Amino acid sequence: MTNFKDIIKKIEYKFSKHQLPDIKVGDLIRLGISIQESGKQRVQPFEGTVIALHKAGLNTTITVRKILQGIGVERVFPIHASCLTSIQVLRRSQVSRAKLYYLRNRTGKATRLKEKFEKLPPIWVNKLP
């Protein structure tokens, strides 16, 4: 007899993306978002800092913040969503918090994070299926 949790794990594995980069809070990432406008499909980049990571299996989400024309813009992306076509980790930062919500109250140079210099693996650009 199959356990209910085993059935859910099989379904989640079927719909999850397996080639995801290691995303951490404080990373500067570039996401490729597939957008359909007037019958045409294009990929729109969204580049920003990961301020929160909520791990929940197939429902894992990241909150990405960027400053656009002097206004802070935050978007929450489900990592396993079909609209995400690519994820690039551009830079890692050294942070000591799990959530960087304090960046919302800071402006200008105060929003900079200390960069962590580490050797990145050669495959950081992941084209997701």
Swiss-Prot record:
Gene3D superfamilies: 2.30.30.790. One of its GO terms (molecular function) is structural constituent of ribosome. Keywords: Plastid, Ribonucleoprotein, Ribosomal protein. One of its GO terms (cellular component) is ribosome. SUPFAM superfamilies: Translation proteins SH3-like domain (SSF50104). Its main location: plastid. GO terms for biological process: translation. It is found in: Plastid. Belongs to the bacterial ribosomal protein bL19 family. This is Large ribosomal subunit protein bL19c. It comes from Prototheca wickerhamii. The gene is rpl19.
